[in-house]
Each structure stands twice: as C-alpha cells, then as structure tokens.
Amino acid sequence: MAGGHCGSFAASAASSGEIVQLNVGGTRFSTSRQTLMWIPDSFFSSLLSGRISTLRDETGAIFIDRDPAAFAPILNFLRTKELDLRGVSINVLRHEAEFYGITPLVRRLLLCEELERSSCGSVLFHGYLPPPGIPSRKVTNTARSSVDARNGLNSMEGEARGNGTQPVLAGNGEDTIRLGVPVDPRKVLIVAGHHNWIVAAYAHFAVCYRIKESSGWQQVFTSPYLDWTIERVALNAKVVGGPHGDKDKMVAVASESSIILWSVQDGGSGSEIGVFSLGVPVDALFFIGNQLVATSHTGKVGVWNAVTQHWQVQDVVPITSYDTAGSFLLLGCNNGSIYYIDMQKFPLRMKDNDLLVTELYHDPSNDAVTALSVYLTPKTSVSGNWIEIAYGTSSGAVRVIVQHPETVGSGPQLFQTFTVHRSPVTKIMLSEKHLVSVCADNNHVRTWTVTRFRGMISTQPGSTPLASFKILSLEETESHGSYSSGNDIGPFGERDDQQVFIQKVVPITNKLFVRLSSTGKRICEIQAVDCTTISSFTVRECEGSSRMGSRPRRYLFTGHTNGSIQMWDLTTAMDMVNKTEDKDAGGPTEEELLKLLDQCDLSTSRCATPNISPATSVLQHSRLRESSSSLQLQHHETIHEAATYGATRPYRESPLLARARRTESFHSYRDFQTLNLNRSIERPVPENGHMGPAQTEVKGAAGECAMSERRSPGTEVRCGRESDGGLEVHRTAEGLSEPKKRSAEDENEHKVEFRKKGFEAGGFLGRKKVPYLASSPSTSDGGTDSPGTASPSPTKTTPSPRHKKSDSSGQEYSL
C-alpha cells in the first residue's frame, strides 16, 4: 500500500516536471509544465489540461500563433515572477498578457498605464456633466385606441397621437414595413451652444444647461419625451422681443420634416411654442436673430418669427449650401446661383406673403455652389458698402466675390479664383486672416493668407498659399441622421480669431485631435476621462465671468455614448501651444493612426476614402459607414440646373447634404409622392416585385426619378440610374388619379417674382430673375383661406411627435 502511494507521487512529480515544447509564431521555446500551470484558469492551464485543442508542428511542439517577441517577457515572468520588457511596449505586452490570461502581469501593466492616465483628466479638462434622467413616456388608453383606428384606415390627417412605436410605412393596408435605425436612448447625438447655454440632444429628448460663475454648469430644462428620434437641434440664448420677454431662451429640435419649438425661462420652466412642418426632411436648423430657420436640400426654406408668431414655407431652387450674415440668409444652389433672404423684413411681399428671395450672384461655370462663407468686414455699415463672400463649387473651384462701394448698382464682382481642388469643395471659411477650403478627398484642406488694407481684402500682395493637409474622418455605415450634425469637423471659432478643426478619426473612439484650421498644427489631443466613446462634439465660447476685463473662454464640449458631457478648455490649450515652438505635429501620426484603426477593417473600394468596417474579431453593435468624403468626381461636368442631389449625385454632397443619401422618405410632399421599396422586413415581396397599389409617380426638380437612397436595416429606397449615368424613370399609375393631381398642383402653384433688392438696403442688386418657383399653399392664423396668405397655426394642423403614433394611412408616412 505504501509502495503504491510512493509510485503515484513519483508519477505526479514527473508529470509536473515534464518539459513542454512550444512553437510561438515560428520561434521555439522550451519550458516546464509547472512553469506554465502555476496560474489557474490561464490559457496554458486550459491548453495542457485538454480543454483547448492543440495544434502541433512537425517536431511535435505545440504551435501558438502569437508574437514570439511579446511572448518572451511573458514566459520570463512565468519563470521568475519578474518583468523584463525587453523592448516591448507596455500596451502590446498587456494585450498579449490578457490573451494568455496572466492576471498578475495584467494588473501590474494596468497600474503602469494608470500613472499617465487619470479619471480627473488632464490640465485641459474643465468639467463633467453626468447623464440626465430619461423623461417618462406617456401612453394612454386613448392613444392605444387611436392606434387601432388608424390601423383601420379610418382617421383623418392631424389626429395622430403618440404611442411610442416606430414610424411605419403602409404597404397594401394589411402589412407594414418598419423604418428607422434603433438608436441608443442614452447616447448624446448632438451638442450645440449659444452664449452661456448648451443643449444636448439625445434620441428622444433634449436637455439645456447654463453656466454661472458662482454655481458653474446647471441643468435648466428637459424636454418631454418624443416618439421620434431627434436629428437636428438649435438654440437661441438671447431672444430679443420674444413673446415672454427678452429673457426667454428658445430651443428647437427636428425629426424628419417636423420641428418642435420650446420657450425656456431662466428659472427652468419651459413651454411648447408650436410644432411646424417643412414638408420634406430638414437638413439644417438654426436661428437668425429671433427667426427659426429650417432648410432642406430639396429646395424648401421654413422660417418662424418670434415676434409675429408666423411660420412660412418657401420653395426655392434645390439647396446645396448656406451661410448667414447678420439678418441675411444666403443660399448656394445647384444651378450655380447664390440667393439671399432678408429675415429682418420678413415677410416683404404682402401681395402673396412670399419671402423676398433675390439672386445675388451666378457662378460663371454654372457649377453647383457646394460651400458658402460670408465675411462682414468692419467697414460694413447699415448701407452695406462692403461685403466678401467665398464659395466652393462641385468642380473644386474656390472663388471670392466682393461688393465694392463703387459697384452698388452692379452687384458683387469676382475677386479671386483658385482651382487647387480636384474634388468638390465641401466646406469653406473666409475669416479676417485666412481663407480655408475643404474638399471631398479625405477632407483635404487648403489654406491661404488673406491680405487686408483698412479691414478690406486687398490684391497687394494678394492671397498667398499657406498650408495643405487632411482632416481624415471616417463615418459609420448605417449612421443615424444626426451623425453629420453632431460630428461636424468645423472650422470652429470667431472669424477675427484663430479657428480650429476637430478631428475624430474613427467613429468608435474616445480620442479627438484639435488642430489649427490655418496650418493644421495640432493644438492638443483629448481623451475621455471615463474612456467612453465620444458620440458628438462642438466648440463654443462662454462668458464665465461678468467682471470687467474678463474675456470669453473657448471650450470643447464632447457628448458620450453613456449620456455624459465632458468639457475641455481650448483657451488654455491654445495659450500653451503658442508658447512652445518645437511641436510641429498635426493630425495623428502613422503610428497613432494605425493604433486608432486597430478595431477596424478597411474594405477595398474605388472611393476617394476607403470604406471602414469593424474587424470580425471585434465586431460591435454599431456598424461603420463609408466616409462622408467617399465619392469623387469621375470627370468634371456641368451640373445642370435641373439636376438634384436626390437624383443623380454625380459628386459628393456638401456637409449640408451628407444625410440626403440615407434620408427618410419625403413624406407627402407633393413633388415626391411615392417610394420604390426594394425589400421589406415584415412581409415578403410579391412575385411581381410591387409592394402594392400605393406606388405612385415620383417627380423631382431634374425630372422624374426614384426617391433618393435610404439606408436602414429593413428597407432601401434608391434612385434609379441608367447605365450611362442618367435617370431611370419609374412610373406606375396604380392608386393615382392623374387629372386630380394635375388640377391640385395648378391651383397651388403660381409664379413668384424676385424683386431686385440691394443687399443691406442697397448694397447688392440681383441681376436676374430666379427660375420659376412655387410658394407653398398656406392659410393665415386667423382662418381666412387664400392661396397667398400665411400658413395656419402650426399647432392646429401638425401634431406633436410627443403624441404622434404609428399610423399606416396618415399623410406623414403613407405611400
């Protein structure tokens, strides 16, 4: 019996001292079984116990397909419990130690990394706003019964009330097709600011914050829960002459074609002013003074005036860019023209209540104006004696036009032209000292130094080239409509100060690069203090102190996927970088870029920017989208006046149109009355390929075409194209009474004259009449119906998304 025990012990000892041959990445290592097994539940204990299948080479050694250079210090740690880096970076070694499950080594390496990283951030970290509470949803029995009535196709338009379901498209009255990409309700989609206020837009609600010197940042207002996902947001922290006094603030959000506007008091109470409809998806939402302005690339402008409480929708030429100057809204259009609207004199045409839209300038090459920037010089007065406009075109040209005091009667004159871009210009900025342009080739930036004499741009010695660099920024494959608005690269800052770009290299990252817009020089890089993914960002100046001599400070606000908002002091960062002259770094270095791309696979494509997709080994819930700068012009052709972005898209859209390819349907807009659905989620497509008799004829400004491409998990709506690049016309006659449609359009459409008005009361005179445009039919608040009167009270006709329900026959989502 004793001999048996001795034999068993000897066998056990021999087993623990067994020599193990390893082949790690082609390099052979010899060690003992005891060395590999002393850490429980590690890779080696599982391997040698048979829980993991082994692969042996020709010599019988266990093959492990890992880096041998990183394995050497790990094996040395298993032998001696001491760490010798042997030239391997701590980050790489920690990654390998995590793979092998060497827990004691991982803890040591994490502690080393914590020496340089703090949960309180760096010297630039300014503050942290925790995630707010999500407002409760109100679902009533009345709403549920309303759902049943709508599903029975028995309700009238405008009676919808919210039940919290996703919008749906009706097929043949029996089945439905769900639309929309699910969005994390905790993620900050957009951050916007004005003066000492910021607003954070989440998926279904918005939160306003205010800063005071004594108390810091405080949450002031939280909107009600919305059934629709927010895509645009605007904030006005200084409302003069508003309905509730000068201390009111206004915040607006947009989802698809609907806009909700709230009034917020200093005390934190808020009230809904109204719900408005643009009729087509909203691409931009902003304030000009007291006016709330919404624009769509399809060629619609909506304006709401805080004093008159009036909502006006105006048809214009399809819009490709915009900018504001004082009380003026300037529109760059796809026919090569620049128009302006005077918001201070809104509305001017009392005979039909149309906005006064005047053509300011027409591009000599008839190229679409894809980027626009207006600079009001200090010499500009009420008489409008000097103004400068820089714009970029679809062919890559950058032009500067100026209004001289001597040329008031003849309109602006072409001052300079630069043809340095081979891709469409997507952004442009004319400031006091620099001209900055960005094109679609991986956000390629060209900058010039602007020479001025007495505040006015000068030709002696003229604008001189300054820098050329790129702001590489990849986007998600199936991103929400708010992504382009919440992740705009800039440039940010006042035009008489240094401006900055914010570079977010990959969509799933916790790091941003802040760079000078003039030279591309890196000012700083910021990393989330809690290591969460940055989902949105913006740069604003806030007046933290009211003391005499204090200056506003510039802050970078970052929204995160966990709902928090983090703040960074860019004023300090710029002061620090100005003191050090030895830092010449710009964007991420090659090593930094490769590190950022560790979690991504770049797919091959013919695009100017490679598509980005998640590595199969680290696949996340969020899919990645091709870069916004991914479509390059094949050959430069004139963009005809009739063409629209929703039709041919021969080049990459401006940032204003970045979401046009994945926009939702154009609802019931009379010029876009159907969708050509290629596939469905909830029901199979019949053999004939038609979804039902709801398909109708689609019209666009370029002629008849299918709806612009829509990307969603369940449906795709794409614009038909012929093999030669032209439009493929999709026509159906089912479910449509053509004579009735024609007569309705004839009643609603009438010609609009564009009065020859000067910019700034005589500064600019329009040269031509605008092509035939139609004003949207409307009625006045008073209830008198006439084709030329103002639109009715928006709260009477347009239901709020808070009460909007999933309907299968309503105008908002009907086919």
Swiss-Prot record:
Interacts with HCN3. Residues 18-87 form the BTB domain. WD repeats lie at residues 225-272, 277-314, 316-351, 420-458, 538-578. The keyword Aminoacyl-tRNA synthetase does not apply. It is found in: Cell membrane. The modification Phosphoserine is found at residues 605, 665, 712, 793. Brain (at protein level). Expressed in the liver kidney, and heart. This is BTB/POZ domain-containing protein KCTD3. SMART domains: BTB, WD40. InterPro entries: BTB/POZ_dom (IPR000210), SHKBP1/KCTD3 (IPR047876), SHKBP1_KCTD3_BTB_POZ (IPR047825), SKP1/BTB/POZ_sf (IPR011333), T1-type_BTB (IPR003131), WD40/YVTN_repeat-like_dom_sf (IPR015943), WD40_repeat_dom_sf (IPR036322), WD40_rpt (IPR001680). Residues 707-815 are annotated as: Disordered.
